[in-house]
């Protein structure tokens, strides 16, 4: 019985450590780390947007500047950005998610539908 409790305690302790390590590895990028010029592209066009280091507390996101109104034409809404542990979300003014871009190497990808995809890439 004592051995069973010891094994159970070790297993539970191991799960807690694993959870902490997993949670620690999924850090959210800061506004400063995403700040700068980015390119949004699909099969027909590409345009530049800019992430600013200003946080938007009402949406839990970061300020995004779309001077060419590229994203507004795709999503028909004002867009702000939000970071996720495994990608970047484009948010509406109320904080709801319009699109999520998953990390794919040095860029982020959003699959809109069958064959249609948007990519988001930081410009150096």
Swiss-Prot record:
It comes from the Bacteria. It is found in: Periplasm. Disulfide bonds join 47-70. It holds the Pfam family Inh. Residues 1-24 form the signal peptide. Coiled coil: none annotated. The keyword Disulfide bond applies. GO terms for cellular component: periplasmic space. Keywords: Disulfide bond, Metalloenzyme inhibitor, Metalloprotease inhibitor, Periplasm, Protease inhibitor, Signal. GO terms for molecular function: metalloendopeptidase inhibitor activity. Belongs to the protease inhibitor I38 family. Monomer. Inhibitor of the alkaline protease. Inhibits SMP by formation of a non-covalent complex with a molar ratio of 1:1 and shows a high specificity. This is Alkaline proteinase inhibitor. It comes from Serratia marcescens. The gene is inh.
